[in-house]
């Protein structure tokens, strides 16, 4: 645990008692603060009381008298589409609002570091797609190289549940836009921006607000090194804003398709090969086609981002290459479930938006595509250019009929349920084809989260194997 510093003897309200909320309460208490907890769920409140915490109704009048700070969980809206009433009450009372990420950055460094030979470092990864894989890949590479490392944030543990830093340790954090938007302190040593595509726009008031939330990680006084994906306009803009000149090697540009040879430092993938260029010279080349845990161009972009981040931390190209080869991938992200009769079954349940689904569809030449769920703003019409590899679509969930109207002449069948979609796709698939779950939609119409959707797909597939 990382005790929260600077709030000794102060009352701190905590809103939202999920994983991060309870971890925050423990860290506040360990640092000498008095946490006052609240959640709309009676079950969550009872669980907190069972752990010995004080539960206080933050919805009542004058609830914030004498309170120094409100710490809120990332899933609770603080501005758009409308502020949570408790957050609105805190802001009206002049009480600052923060989250566990902000508390982490104000508390991570300690006096113990004076005795360290090598200062601990923090690497933060943000973006629309590939954050989790990139974060896990950086952590894996560091571990394989023998560097002490911990991983947390939007993946794995809550940040305040981490152990205090060791000599030379690297903490790798995945940060969503919800987390970067509200954190009052963001001071990573290395920051990674993978890409940007429309997502969570209701929470940010539009695309501009969404990009602004991500960009906060790179604010003045932020990272020593920035790794920026430049395959979208926002990444190009951000890299330009952070660079003093094209040869500035504090910014490492990455791409999954473009040649980037003219910049101070770049890492890019083309035709299955990763190349590192620095000041006009090629420094390394890696064959990504031999990496079983990193299929497709989208994973090649993740590999470029992780490679660049690890190079800034002093790892050698061959160390990184060896670790890339041993990376098994993450569940629900281009995850091979099995193969039968020459037909491969792949679970990419995390492909919840158009951009991530497009990248999944580009990874295989012949696809039986299972898609649908709770559609997002804008639908899936933008996927039209990527449907050439789709032999047939099997549509499920709330948006099945809407999706059918948006995929044009692509052969399709409305299946409604995962069970029927898997059965029909498996029945019709031919050797050499891939049955791919890449929903291009949220899961909440039929499942509590994308993980449960992916698990259901895998269960149905394994029953057929």
UniProtKB/Swiss-Prot annotation:
Q: Name one GO biological process term.
A: regulation of cell shape
- Cited InterPro entries: Mur-like_cat_sf, Mur_ligase_C, Mur_ligase_C_dom_sf, Mur_ligase_cen, MurD
Q: Where does ATP bind?
A: 127-133
Listed under GO cellular component are: cytoplasm
Q: Any keyword Membrane?
A: no
User: What top-level class of enzyme does the UniProt entry assign?
Assistant: ligase
EC number of this enzyme: 6.3.2.9
Q: In which pathway does it act?
A: Cell wall biogenesis; peptidoglycan biosynthesis
Molecular function per GO: ATP binding; UDP-N-acetylmuramoylalanine-D-glutamate ligase activity
Q: Which UniProt keywords apply?
A: ATP-binding, Cell cycle, Cell division, Cell shape, Cell wall biogenesis/degradation, Cytoplasm, Ligase, Nucleotide-binding, Peptidoglycan synthesis
Localized where? Cytoplasm
Write down the chemical reaction(s) this protein catalyses: UDP-N-acetyl-alpha-D-muramoyl-L-alanine + D-glutamate + ATP = UDP-N-acetyl-alpha-D-muramoyl-L-alanyl-D-glutamate + ADP + phosphate + H(+)
Top-rank taxon, per record: Bacteria
Q: What is the documented function of this protein?
A: Cell wall formation. Catalyzes the addition of glutamate to the nucleotide precursor UDP-N-acetylmuramoyl-L-alanine (UMA).
Q: Indicate the family of this protein.
A: Belongs to the MurCDEF family.
Its protein name is: UDP-N-acetylmuramoylalanine--D-glutamate ligase
Question: Which gene is this protein's source?
Answer: murD
